[in-house]
C-alpha cells in the first residue's frame, strides 16, 4: 500500500474504516524529502555507536582525499589510497538507516510484545495523538522468559503479557513528548487514538554485549525460519567489524599517548567485543580473511594487564544459542500447540488490571 493510500484511509472517519493500519517500516533517510533534510534526531543519538562510526568514516575519507592531492606520492601509494577511499565509500553508502521512521497508526492499533532488533535503543517522538507503552525491564529472568517465548517451536500456551503480568509498567506518551527506550527493554504499544510518530533505532557503545546477544538469537531464529530477514538490523555485523577496525583499534593503539576518560568503560567495550565478535556471512563489508585479521588484531592490541590470559577466547564462532526447551506433552504424547493469542483491548485491559494498572 502506498503512503498516499495510507493517508487517505487515515483521514477517513473512524466508523467508516475497514482496516486498522499501523505503518511501522516507513524510513525516510536519504529520500531527499523536506522531512529527511530538516529533521534532526535527539542529541542523545549523536552519542550512538553508529554516529561515532559515521563521523569517523567521513573524517577518514577527507584525510585520504587530502593525501591524494599530494603530487609527490608514489604510484604504489596512490593505488593504496584510491583503494582505501573506495572501501570507505562502500561502507558509507551501505551504512544502516534507522533514524527517520515515520510511524502512522490508526486508533486501536497494537504492536505486540517485542525487543527492538539487535537490542537497539529507541527514540520515539509523538507528533500527533497518544501511545500507551507497557514496558518490562530486561532482568535476567524476564529475558529468559522472553527468549523462550520468542523461540518456542511447539506453540505458546500463555500470552507473555500474562506470564509477566507483574513486570509491566504503563507509560503514556502524548503529542510533543519524546520517549527513549533503553537497550533490550521488552515492550508492547497500544494506540488509543490516531497517531503520528517520528522515531529511530540506534546502538550504544555501553550496550555491546546485550546487542550481540540478541543479534545472535535473531540470527538463529532466521536460520530456523522463525524470523524474516527484514526484521533484522541488517548491517549489525558489518557495523561491529567496522567499529572495531576504525574506532576501537584507535583507542587501544593510542592508550599511552591519548588515555581515554573512562578506562573501565573501554575495558567493558573491549571485553564485550572480544567475547562476541566472530566471523559471519552477514559481515559482507569484509572478506573472511579480513574478519580473521580484525579479530586477531583486537587480541594483539589488548594490554596484557587488562584480562587474565584464560579470559581471552580463541578466534572462533560463539556457541550456538539453543531454541526454547521442549514443551510439555499432552495425554496423547503429542506436544500441545496453542496458537498465538488474539490481542484485544479487553484482554489487554484484564491482564494489565491484574497487574494493578488501568487504562
Each model region followed by its residue ranges:
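N-terminal accessory scaffold of Fe(II)-dependent oxygenases
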Residues: 1-178, 188-359
Amino acid at each position: 500500500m502506498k503512503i498516499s493510500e495510507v493517508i487517505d484511509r487515515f483521514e477517513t472517519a473512524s466508523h467508516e474504516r475497514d482496516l486498522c493500519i499501523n505503518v511501522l517500516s516507513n524510513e525516510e533517510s536519504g529520500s531527499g524529502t523536506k522531512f529527511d533534510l530538516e529533521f534532526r534526531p535527539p542529541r542523545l543519538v549523536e552519542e550512538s555507536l553508529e554516529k561515532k562510526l559515521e563521523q569517523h568514516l567521513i573524517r577518514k575519507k577527507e584525510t585520504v582525499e587530502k593525501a591524494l592531492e599530494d603530487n609527490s606520492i608514489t604510484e604504489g601509494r596512490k593505488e593504496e589510497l584510491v583503494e582505501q577511499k573506495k572501501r570507505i565509500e562502500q561502507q558509507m553508502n551501505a551504512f544502516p538507516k534507522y533514524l527517520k521512521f515515520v510511524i502512522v497508526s490508526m486508533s486501536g492499533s497494537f504492536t505486540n510484545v517485542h525487543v527492538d532488533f539487535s537490542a537497539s535503543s529507541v527514540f520515539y517522538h509523538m507528533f500527533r495523538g497518544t501511545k500507551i507503552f507497557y514496558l518490562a525491564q530486561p532482568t535476567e529472568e524476564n529475558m529468559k522468559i522472553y527468549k523462550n517465548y520468542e523461540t518456542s517451536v511447539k506453540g505458546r500456551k500463555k500470552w507473555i503479557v500474562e506470564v509477566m503480568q507483574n513486570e509491566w509498567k504503563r507509560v503514556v506518551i502524548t503529542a510533543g513528548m519524546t520517549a527513549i527506550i533503553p537497550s533490550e527493554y521488552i515492550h508492547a504499544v497500544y494506540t488509543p487514538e490516531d497517531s503520528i510518530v517520528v522515531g529511530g533505532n540506534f546502538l550504544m557503545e555501553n550496550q555491546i554485549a546485550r546487542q550481540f546477544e540478541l543479534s545472535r538469537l535473531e540470527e538463529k531464529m532466521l536460520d530456523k525460519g522463525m524470523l524474516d530477514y527484514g526484521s533484522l538490523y541488517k548491517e549489525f555485523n558489518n557495523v561491529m567489524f567496522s567499529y572495531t577496525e576504525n574506532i576501537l583499534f584507535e583507542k587501544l593503539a593510542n592508550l599511552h599517548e591519548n588515555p581515554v576518560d573512562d578506562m573501565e568503560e573501554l575495558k567493558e567495550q573491549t571485553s564485550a567485543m572480544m567475547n562476541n565478535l566472530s566471523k559471519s556471512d552477514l559481515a559482507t563489508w569484509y572478506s573472511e580473511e579480513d574478519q580473521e585479521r580484525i579479530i586477531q588484531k583486537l587480541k594483539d592490541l589488548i594490554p596484557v594487564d587488562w584480562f587474565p590470559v584464560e579470559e581471552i577466547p580463541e578466534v572462533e564462532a560463539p556457541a550456538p544459542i539453543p531454541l526454547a526447551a521442549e514443551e510439555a506433552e499432552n495425554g496423547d504424547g503429542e506436544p500441545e500447540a496453542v496458537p498465538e493469542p488474539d490481542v484485544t483491548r479487553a484482554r489487554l485491559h484484564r491482564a494489565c488490571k491484574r497487574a494493578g494498572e488501568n487504562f
